Amino acid sequence: IRRPPRSTLFPYTTPFRSGGFSPELLEKIADPIVGMEIPFHYRNKAQFPFGKDKNGVTVTGFYAGRTHDIIANTDCALGVEQNQEILETILSFMEQYQMEPYDEKTGKGLLRHVLIRYGFTTKEIMVCLVINAKKIPHCEKLVELLQKIEGMTSITISVNQKNTNVIMGDSYEVLWGQAFITDYIGEIKYQISPLSFFQVNPVQTEKLYGLALEYADLKGDETVWDLYCGIGTISLFLAQKAKQVYGVEIIPQAIEDARKNAQINGIENAKFYVGKAEEVLPGYYADYAKAHPGEQAHADVIVVDP
C-alpha cells in the first residue's frame, strides 16, 4: 500500500479508505503515493450525457451529485482541451436541426451520451455518439463538422434503446474513419475501440506499470498471470521481460482486442483467455497436470487489477 505524502491534495480525512490504518502507522509501513506533476487535462477518456436544463435548453456536462440533473459544462479541467470543441460542435448541430436529447423519464429523444477518447502520444481522437435510435438524421452533416477537428480519427455510433443507466450499447457502427484509435504505453502500441477498457490516465499508468515491472523483477524465464487483463495493457508491458504471460478477462471483446494488440506489437509470448479468473486459472492447472504427468504448473508472478 501507499500513503498520501505530507503535502498533498488528499489529506487523511478518511483513514478507513487506507484499510483503517492510522496516519502514524501508515508513515511507517507505506511509501508515499506517486503523484502527478500537473494533475490537469490528463484523462484520455470522457463521457458526457445530454439533456435539458430547467429552462428547456439542451445542455451537456456532468450529473449533479446523487442525481441525473445535468450541470452544464463543456470545459472540464480533467479532460483534454479538445473535448470542448467537440461538445460545442455537437450542441450546435443539435440546435440547427432541432434534435432532442434523450429524456430518461419519457424514454424519448435521440442523443444520450458522447464518448470521447484521445491518444496522448498519437494525438488521435475518437467520438462515439450513443443514441436512442438506429441512426442520426442529417448524420453526414455532423460527420462533416467533426471531421474538421484536428486529430479526428474515428467517428462511431452505439445504439442504446434500453431503459438503463448503462451508457454504451452492446455494439457500435463506424460512421467515418477507423473503428479504433491507437496509443502507446512505453513502447507498446494499443488499439482502443469504443468498448475497450484502457487506463484513463496515461502519465500515471506508465509510472504504475514501471513500478509493477520493478517489483516483479523479471529475469526472462518467468511465467506471469495477469488477472482481469482488459485489452492486455499490463500483460503486453510485462511480456517484454517475461518468458510467458497469460491474461484472463471475462469480456470477450476485450480479449479480442488483447490478441490484436499482441499481434501488432509482434509479441508471441502472451496468451489470453476469456472467462472468470477464479475458473480459468484452476482449469489451466488441472489441464496442465493431465498433459504433463508428474509436473505441476506454477506462476512466478500474478498481477491482479480487478
Predicted regions and their residues:
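Short, small-residue-biased leader/transition segments that mark boundaries at the very start
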Residues: I1-P15
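Short, flexible active-site loop motifs that bind/organize anionic cofactors or intermediates
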Residues: P5, N73-C76, L195, V245
